[in-house]
């Protein structure tokens, strides 16, 4: 299965991609949380794409998106967050608390992610780029 053809998204520095599982109960919730960030940086005119897939497609799609050099959040055992910055540097942040501090510092926005929002065993990932 060629994920590249199926995805058909024009990736660019003005693009944010959110990847969620269709069978994940928090897909909509994750999207809403990231939308809060977008609301605060809407002057940057960032395009948003939401991609949902079933678990069987999830790893392949995630690997494809990672090759696009986008920032990546993986909420599995312990969150490891990679933020692709405008400069091209990839910043590694080790927890949701650190991610929240980063957002507060960069965008002066205090109501973004609360760690308890993601306390469950469901595998889920968000992929995004902050410019």
Predicted regions and their residues:
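Eukaryotic N-terminal low-complexity, Ser/Thr- and Lys/Arg-rich leader segments
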Residues: 1-16, 114-131
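Local sequence-structure signature of Cys/Sec-based thiol-disulfide redox active-site neighborhoods
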Residues: 2-56
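Short coil/turn segments at beta-strand junctions that form active-site/ligand-binding loops
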Residues: 14, 77, 88
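Beta-strand cores of modular interaction/reader domains in eukaryotic scaffold and signaling proteins
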Residues: 17-19, 49, 80-83, 91-92
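Short acidic, S/G/P-rich loop/turn micro-motifs used as interaction or catalytic elements
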Residues: 22-29, 88, 123-129
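Alpha-helical interaction elements in eukaryotic regulators
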Residues: 26-30, 57, 77, 92-99
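Thioredoxin-like thiol-disulfide oxidoreductase module
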Residues: 50-77, 84-85, 103-109
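Non-catalytic, surface beta->alpha helical segment in thiol-disulfide oxidoreductase systems
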Residues: 83-119
């Amino acid at each position: 299965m060629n994920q590249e053809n199926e995805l058909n998204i024009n990736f660019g520095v003005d693009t944010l991609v959110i990847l969620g599982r269709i069978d994940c109960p928090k897909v909509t919730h994750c999207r809403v949380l990231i939308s809060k960030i977008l609301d605060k940086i809407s002057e940057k005119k960032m395009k948003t794409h939401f991609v949902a897939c079933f678990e069987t497609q999830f790893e392949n799609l995630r690997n494809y998106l990672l090759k696009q050099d986008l920032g990546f959040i993986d909420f599995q055992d312990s969150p490891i967050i990679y933020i692709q910055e405008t400069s091209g540097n990839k910043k590694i942040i080790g927890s949701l608390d650190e991610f929240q501090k980063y957002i507060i510092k960069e965008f002066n926005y205090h109501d973004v992610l609360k760690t308890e929002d993601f306390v469950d065993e469901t595998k889920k990932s968000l992929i995004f780029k902050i410019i």
